[in-house]
Amino acid sequence: MGSPMASLVATLLVLTISLTFVSQSTANYFYSSPPPPVKHYTPPVKHYSPPPVYHSPPPPKKHYEYKSPPPPVKHYSPPPVYHSPPPPKKHYVYKSPPPPVKHYSPPPVYHSPPPPKKHYVYKSPPPPVKHYSPPPVYHSPPPPKKHYVYKSPPPPVKHYSPPPVYHSPPPPKKHYVYKSPPPPVKHYSPPPVYHSPPPPKKHYVYKSPPPPVKHYSPPPVYHSPPPPKKHYVYKSPPPPVKHYSPPPVYHSPPPPKKHYVYKSPPPPVKHYSPPPVYHSPPPPKKHYVYKSPPPPVKHYSPPPVYHSPPPPKKHYVYKSPPPPVKHYSPPPVYHSPPPPKKHYVYKSPPPPVKHYSPPPVYHSPPPPKKHYVYKSPPPPVKHYSPPPVYHSPPPPKEKYVYKSPPPPPVHHYSPPHHPYLYKSPPPPYHY
């Protein structure tokens, strides 16, 4: 009997344990009940993966703006179009994207479950873990949502993919230096004849080598820079080397400075006449300004009449211009469109027109030019989209880029070079 009783007790214990486990499992299921929704929410995540599509709506907004401007554009020529867009920028009409945020309303729900997880997930993680084996993948996307920007940056990266190609050019510079030295070696075959100067070497072995530099017309540039390295001149020369392909001759004179060889350099000075031509490249930088002004000038040749509309923005100036309008029998056609925009101006201007004569028109346009000439340049800036290509190489120069900017200074240093030559002669005189 003892054995049957023991077996019964054992079975009862097993049943109780199983029931407790069942209750616990049910309890766990109660906690895991939220996860199921998570599974349902996972699909939304997949749908959210293409949020970029939501970014596309903004363009339509642009169309929205274009819908209103078109009418004026016809009557107001192109200028009105440019003026109308600016205001929207100030108002940040693009802030309307919030509507898409409404579409993101579900994500908040997705975020709400996590908190509970923090409170109870730790207690019953083991069971959920099994069901959440795939969720981990879904948890990774949420972080991007927090950064939100993380999703948008990738596209720019794609556009920046080409710049890396420009990073490769810098290396060529290093090769450029290697290419130039070899030739010098060949030219150094005759230098033996110049070994006669060795006596000077006793005074300045480093200074005497320069004489051979004459035959070493191009190399001198590379040898002379090394000393400057102490003064950091080396950092700035590298960049110039490209544009200063001829300047090497310019550097050759310095060596002569040390001795009476300076008298012979004068002839090279004549050869330096061309270097100024190389200084002309810098002007391209001036193009920076040159590019922006020209466009305005071309487009503004006829605008004089169009400039009169700008005053309307001042409200008060607009009332005074109308007078000239009468004198400008033909222009009235152009002025009539702008007034409609303001409505109010169109009603009161006529009277003043008679008293304001035409001069006011001329005075009103000038100011607009100042205000709009600067606004119009921005388009040219678009043409400057390529310049970024030049900026991409600089990064590689980072090691020396910070001092490579001196390229422009180099142009300024061109004159200093002459002083440098004059400074070197004095020593000989002292000797």
UniProtKB/Swiss-Prot annotation:
Sequence repeat start-end pairs: 33-41, 49-55, 56-63, 68-76, 77-83, 84-91, 96-104, 105-111, 112-119, 124-132, 133-139, 140-147, 152-160, 161-167, 168-175, 180-188, 189-195, 196-203, 208-216, 217-223, 224-231, 236-244, 245-251, 252-259, 264-272, 273-279, 280-287, 292-300, 301-307, 308-315, 320-328, 329-335, 336-343, 348-356, 357-363, 364-371, 376-384, 385-391
Subcellular location(s) per record: Secreted, Primary cell wall
Domain of life, source organism: Eukaryota
InterPro entries given in the database record: Extensin_dom (IPR006706)
Gene Ontology BP term (one): plant-type cell wall organization
Name of one Pfam family that matches: Extensin_2
Annotated signal peptide: 1-27
Region: 13 X 7 AA repeats of S-P-P-P-V-Y-H, residue numbers: 49-391
Chain spans, region Disordered: 42-408
Tissue expression summary: Predominantly expressed in the roots.
GO CC term (a single one): extracellular region
Result of knocking out the encoding gene: Embryo lethality. Germination-defective agravitropic seedlings with severely defective root, shoot, and hypocotyl and a vitreous appearance throughout. Defective Cell Walls.
Region (12 X 8 AA repeats of S-P-P-P-P-K-K-H): 56-371
Keywords: Cell wall, Cell wall biogenesis/degradation, Glycoprotein, Hydroxylation, Repeat, Secreted, Signal
The keyword Secreted is annotated on this UniProt entry: yes
Family: Belongs to the extensin family.
Protein name: Extensin-3
Source species of the chain: Arabidopsis thaliana (Mouse-ear cress)
Gene: EXT3
